[in-house]
Each structure stands twice: as C-alpha cells, then as structure tokens.
A protein has these predicted regions:
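Domain-level signal for soluble alpha/beta catalytic cores
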Residues: 1-793
Length: 793
C-alpha cells in the first residue's frame, strides 16, 4: 500500500439520508430491517472504484444497541453480510467499521478504560465471526479511546487494523491530541495504517496530511469531508470535481489510502478515482527520531532531555509512607515540583516492601497523567506491573529498564513491544557489572539486537551505561563516559545515566554531580536522570544547551537568567529547596487558585477549607474559584490548555464547591448559585459529550444546570423553561439532520410570553446560523460561560 493507491468508499450516512433515513432512526438497524438498501449503496461505491467498503457498523456498540431489541452480534453480522453480498463478483473487501462509543473515558469522563476495551472487543468478535476482511477504527477524537479500540482489535483478531482520527482547524483533536502523538502512539500499538477522517475538507486537512506523512512509516489514510456543511440545508460546499482536484495534492503528500467521509457519495469516489488512480503516492520524508509523548505533549529526544528522579522511594521516608498509605496526592505534588523545575520526563518507581507494585504502578500512572503533561518513564523490572501500567498509559512511554540477561530480554521486551514503549537498556548482564566501556558497549549491542528481533526499532532503545560511585570505584567514571561516547556517537543511540549515583559518600555532592553531568553531556548523554529541584544542576543543563546549539538564540537561557527578578526568584526557590529538600519537593501547591488551575481536587479541597478560616464562602467563589477557572478558560482559548486541563480545573472547582456547600449548610446558609440554565441535545440527536462538558463547566462557575439529556423534543424544553422560569437555554446539535429540530425548539421558545435567551452550539452550528435564529453562538464550553455571565451575571 505504500507503493499503490487503495480506494475506500464515501459516506454511508449521506447516502442513507438521501434514501429517506428518518430523524432519530438508528442507521445501524437497517442491516436487519433493510439490508438490500445497504447492499445497493455498497455496490454503487464499488462500481465507482471503491476497493474496500466500510460495513454499516459505525455505532453498533453495546451502549447504543441496548435501546433496541438486537444484540451487537445481530447487527454486525447482518451489516457484514450486506456488504459482502455487494462484493460478489468483484475483488472488493469489507471492513468492520468501528466508531466512538459516545462517552468520554476516565479521567475526562466516567467510562472506565477496560470497560471501553470490552465494548470494542464485543464489536471485534462479532466482526471476525461474520467474516470481515479488516478492521477500520474511525472518527476518534480521544487518543485514549483510540488506544482502547486498537487494543481490543489486536487482542481479539489477527485482521489488519486501520485507525483514523478527526482533527479540527487548530491542528488538534477535540481533546487536544497532536499529529505526532497520534502517529507514534498508534504506530507503537500495532496499527497497520493510520490517518485522518471527517471534521474538514481535503483543503483544510492537507497541512495535517503533510505533517502526518513526515512522522510515520505506516500507510496514511485520507477520508475527508466534502468540504464544509451549510447549516441551513446540510449540503457540503465542495463538488466532486473540486474534491478530487484537492485530493491530488493529498496523494502527492504521501497518502496512499483514499476515500471520503461526510457529504461524499459515489460521484465523489468516481471523480477521485479518475483523478488519482494513475498516481504514485509521494514518498514520506520521515525523520526517524526517538520520541515519547502524552496526547497533547509530543517530545522528540533531540539534544538533552531531563528525566526527573524524585518519584522513587529509595532513601525517602516520606515517599515510602505515602506509598504504604496510598497517598497519591503526595506523589503528584512531587511530580509537579519536578515539572515546574524543568523536568521533561518523569521516572516513576513505586517498588517498596509492602507495596503491591502490580496494583500501585497503574494507579500512580493514571493519577500523574491527570496532573502533569509530560511523558513518563516506568521504572520497574516487574513485567506484570509494567504491563498493567503501560496498558493504562495514554501516549508513548518508556520502560526503565531491561538488562542484557536473556531472561530479562525475553520477559520485558514483549511487554514494551505490545504497548509501543521505548526501552532503557541497562548495560549489565548475568555476569554482573562490566568493568570496561567495551564490555558495556557489547551488552548494549545485544540489547539493541534483541529489541529489533521483537520488532522494537533501534531509535526506541535508550542505553544506560551505568553510573558507579566515584568514591568507591574512581576509575569507572572514565569507563562510563567512554561508553556514553561510543553508544551515542558510533551507535547513534540515546543515552541514559542516573547522574547523582556518581557522588554517593562524598562531601559537597552537588558539585561532584554537576561536574560529572557536564562532562557526560559533552560526551553524548541525552537523557540524564537528575533532581531538577537542584538549581545548580538545571543551570548546568541550561548553559550546556546554549553551547551545544540546542537553545536557539539563547532564548531559554535568557528567559531563565535574564532579569534580576528572575534571579531573585531562583535564589529564593533554591534556598527553600536546599533547606528541606524532601519536604519542599512535595510542597508544590500551596495556593488555592493554583490547585484549581492544575486540576488537583484533593489539594483544592484542603486549601479551600484552610481559606475559610479567614475568608467567607462568597469570597472564595469570587476571589479564587472564578478567577482560576477564567485563567484556564483563557488558556484554552489561546490553545495552550486543552480539554483535559479544562475538565480537570472544573473537577477541582467542584471539590471547592463541595467544601463551600458543606460550610454553608453547617451555618444554615443558602448555597451559592448564580442562576438556573436548561441545556439539552435536540430531538433526533443522541450525541451529548459536548453538552456534558458544557454542563460541568457551567456548574463549576456557580450556575444551576438542569440537563434534559439528549434526543429531547422541543415541547420538553419549553415545558421545563415555563415550569422553572428559566432565563437561559443551551441547545446542542452535532448532525446537520438535527438542525431542523434545533430551529423548531428555538421557534417554540421564541413564542413564549417571556422568552429566554438561547445559546446554541455543536459541530455543525456556525455563528451565522446562530445569528439567523436569533440566538447566541457558543463555540465551546468557555464561550457558554461568557454568555451565561452576560445573561445571568
């Protein structure tokens, strides 16, 4: 597929609407009630040039099917059969089509990760049993949900698995995922092809296809919409010929699997086939670099990247106590302190007597990913603990570490391979600590060779050349540095060292550690594991990055040291850290506003209780809670914070509100409420993720939200408004077919004697459409808050 084009079909929903699909009707049930219609549509696409048709199974999940009389297996098997019937006499193949579950996964939502995996697995099992030729996971906006679906597909079938996600005009998904994070995560998890579908037309998505082709070795899929929809009539603005012309550039960028999504039909696929079938996809200009990520934070390992060492119980009594007590908030504070000090990766070690590492490591990983947005390096040799943690990690992590023993290689490398993790290879084996650089290099070569046999690319192998204590083995410092030099410069690998080991047992450890770090970076150390809370250590890294050409125009160096105020702040912070390093490392959040902004629920609740000793409840809302939420909202608008941060802050604010409510109740006072709002997803539309996010954010600004749910008739909205004397209504629609329902709801509300203000939003709603209806346009949850402030105060 890298060398020839493969043609997919176009939209199924568009064709079903053309054939009279009724508002609110579940399209997947047509596989049972009208399979000939589906077969006819599939056949039209095949006649237009389609080689792979997507079965009508996009929403055939347990959550949706529970409202019907049919099982997932009933619907999937019927849909696959209808598609296969269309392929008779042709070489076309049938893909099991899997869409999102319609509910946010934890921690942004309430759906547990393993429940999502199980729901997807049920679909996969049904598709395999029905004879699907491949699996296409599509229209994902949450990388975590895409991972759940991909794991289910890989664990329950041997079929090829393709995954496409939907990116908006910001170049990110709805949840903030970047192109590189998507590519490296899904590639590592074993996807056979990846790409983009839906959301925009080929012209708008072209820069994203170009970016994707630069960061993946996999075949790339393009299934864009027919331009952008007109919210008035639902028609898309790009005719077939123009769609096809734009797709020529998409193929030229390196895309090799092409089709269409919303608004496209067989005419589009025919025009596309005519325009590009003789083309050879452009070559991928791929940079094969080392890479770790979270969904919203891609981190290329180019130059020195600091790994924070403090999440480790060794020699840390308070940390040991926290592990034994399950005090994860303390561990989060340690993490935040390191990230604030400049750590770009966090090493995570929870191994301690009395601690169930298999249970604790994934708990800590989930908690850390809620609080900090840097990649994690999972520090354990327990294969079961690593598997449990890697399974719930969102993004591409690293495993620390695998040594040269054959047993360790055979046990740990398969786990890293399954979950797409990078591997730290420790240069020792069953013979013990090697004394020479040459011996360490030989072990490194064996580790790389073993990793490649398991399918782990060499750029995902980082070598730890061993830092030994110079006070006991002085000659070994030079051997370590020589090994680092060879591994990095001759083998071209990233190198790791636990730098502080060098100074154990010596006075003025900081000076020795700093000096060794500088020497090691000069020899090729790229991933130092250090304490970022030590100012002098981070100062050395900042200076080295300038001298090594990593800090362009000395920008980061100047920002760090460029003003007397900054220097004074650094001195004050350093004094605090050095006076009590263990305690201060965990005292990262002492400000209520900061706790809300960071989404730290426990800290926010604790600090709110403390603040009530000197402030009243209303003051907490007006001086702390609202300004903190406004700050996150502004960052969200600017594109420096994303949905996880927005929802995390809302959840922390919710914890503060609970404290305020309890305090008022104890005094016999009334709850703090700023006005009541009715929200609903309109009749015929079953999508409510966006509406639920709006509800959460509004509630945490102090508004009382009456959520009528999804698929809500206009009369129900009107009745609630009249009964509750509502002054503001929020309506959501995701599909163009449900816009008439939105219009009718607005019309009925406007006929009331004292009509409420109305705000509307959703993927298909535009500012012009909202203005035409005489409503406010709420592009997102943040905008809904601003509208509520205008209307209700």
């Amino acid at each position: 597929m890298e060398h020839k084009l493969t043609f997919l079909d176009g939209a199924m929903g568009t064709m079903l609407q053309r054939h009279g699909l009724k508002l609110g009707e579940i399209p997947e049930l047509l596989a049972i009630t009208n399979p000939d219609l589906l077969t006819n549509i599939h056949r039209q696409y095949i006649e237009a040039g389609t080689e792979i048709v997507y079965a009508n199974t996009f929403g055939a999940n347990r959550r949706k099917m529970q409202k019907t009389h049919y099982t997932v297996a009933d619907v999937v098997s019927a849909a696959i059969a209808a598609a296969k019937k269309a392929c008779i006499g042709t070489s076309a193949r049938v893909a099991l089509d899997i869409g999102p579950l319609g509910e946010l996964l934890e921690p942004m939502g309430t759906l547990p990760f393993e429940t999502a995996v199980d729901m997807f697995a049920e679909i996969v099992d049904a598709g395999v049993n029905a004879g699907a030729d491949l699996i296409c996971i599509e229209t994902m906006t949450d990388l975590y949900e895409a991972k759940a679906a991909l794991l289910a597909a890989k664990e329950h079938s041997t079929l090829p698995v393709w995954v496409t996600m939907s990116f908006d005009a910001t170049g990110r998904t709805f949840t903030g995922c970047t192109i590189p994070s998507m590519a490296r995560t899904l590639e590592g998890l074993g996807a056979d092809a990846i790409g983009l579908n839906c959301s925009q037309g080929p012209k708008q998505l072209l820069p994203l296809f170009q970016e994707l082709c630069r960061v993946t070795t996999l075949p790339v899929i393009a299934k864009p919409n027919a331009g952008l929809p007109d919210p008035v009539d639902g028609h898309y603005d790009l005719p077939p010929e123009e769609f096809a012309r734009t797709m020529v550039d998409v193929v030229g960028a390196g895309v090799s699997i092409v089709g269409g999504c919303c608004g496209t039909n067989p005419d589009y696929i025919r025009a596309l086939h005519d325009a590009v079938h003789t083309m050879t996809p452009g070559a991928h200009d791929i940079h094969h670099g080392s890479f770790l990520c979270t969904p919203t934070m891609p981190l290329e390992i180019s130059g020195v990247r600091v790994i924070g060492e403090r999440i480790n119980p060794t020699g840390k009594k308070r940390f040991q106590q926290a592990l034994l007590a399950g005090d994860l908030d303390y561990i989060v504070d340690v993490a935040i302190a390191q990230v604030d000090a400049g750590a770009q990766i966090l090493d995570v070690n929870v191994g301690y007597p009395g601690v169930d590492e298999v249970a604790m490591l994934p708990r800590v990983v989930r908690k850390l990913q809620e609080a900090v947005d840097v990649p994690l390096q999972l520090d354990s040799t327990n294969a079961a603990a690593l598997e449990a943690a890697l399974r719930v990690y969102n993004g591409k992590a690293a495993v620390n570490s695998v040594n040269g023993e054959e047993k360790a290689l055979q046990t740990l490398l398969p786990v890293a391979k399954k979950y797409g993790a990078a591997v730290v290879g420790l240069a020792l084996d069953e013979k013990g600590l090697p004394k020479t650089a040459a011996e360490r290099v030989e072990i490194a070569k064996r580790i790389v060779a073993a990793a490649e046999r398991f399918g782990i690319p060499r750029e995902d192998v980082f070598i730890d050349c061993l830092t030994l204590t110079v006070s006991a083995q002085q000659d070994q410092a030079e051997e370590t540095l020589a090994a680092v030099r060879t591994v990095h410069r001759d083998m071209g690998l990233q190198t790791v060292l636990g730098v502080s080991n060098i100074s154990f047992g010596l006075p003025n450890r900081l000076l020795m550690t700093q000096t060794f770090l500088i020497r090691a970076m000069n020899e090729g150390l790229t991933l130092p594991i250090i304490n970022p809370n030590q100012k002098e250590i981070m100062d050395a890294v900042a200076a080295f990055r300038v001298l090594n050409g990593e800090d362009e125009a000395c920008a980061a160096y100047v920002e760090r040291f460029g003003s007397e105020a900054a220097l004074a702040a650094e001195k004050q912070r350093a004094a605090a850290v050095s006076s009590a390093p263990t305690a201060k490392a965990a005292a990262a959040v002492t400000n209520l506003d900061d706790a809300i902004i960071r989404g730290l629920k426990a800290d926010a609740a604790r600090l709110a209780k403390e603040a009530l000793a000197t402030e009243n409840e209303l003051s907490l809302v007006e001086k702390h809670l609202i300004p903190a939420l406004d700050k996150v909202g502004t960052d969200y608008e600017r594109g420096v914070a994303f949905l996880p941060q927005l929802l995390g802050a809302a959840q922390a604010a919710q914890a503060v509100f609970s404290v305020i409510r309890d305090s008022l109740a104890a005094k016999g006072g009334e709850p703090v409420k700023k006005g009541r709002i009715v929200i609903a997803t309109v009749k015929g539309d079953i999508h409510d993720i966006g509406k639920n996010i709006v509800r959460t954010v509004l509630e945490n600004y102090g508004y009382d939200v009456l959520d009528l749910g999804r698929d809500v008739p206009p009369e129900t909205v009107v009745d609630a408004v009249v009964k509750e004397n509502i002054r503001l209504v929020g309506l959501s629609a995701l599909m163009t077919t449900t816009l008439p329902s939105m219009e009718e709801t607005v019309r009925q509300l406007h006929t009331l004697p004292n009509p409420p203000s109305i705000m509307v939003g959703g993927a298909v709603v535009t500012p012009e459409y909202a203005q035409k209806m005489g409503t406010f346009y709420a592009k997102d949850a943040r905008a809904s808050v601003e509208i509520a402030k205008k209307v209700l105060g």
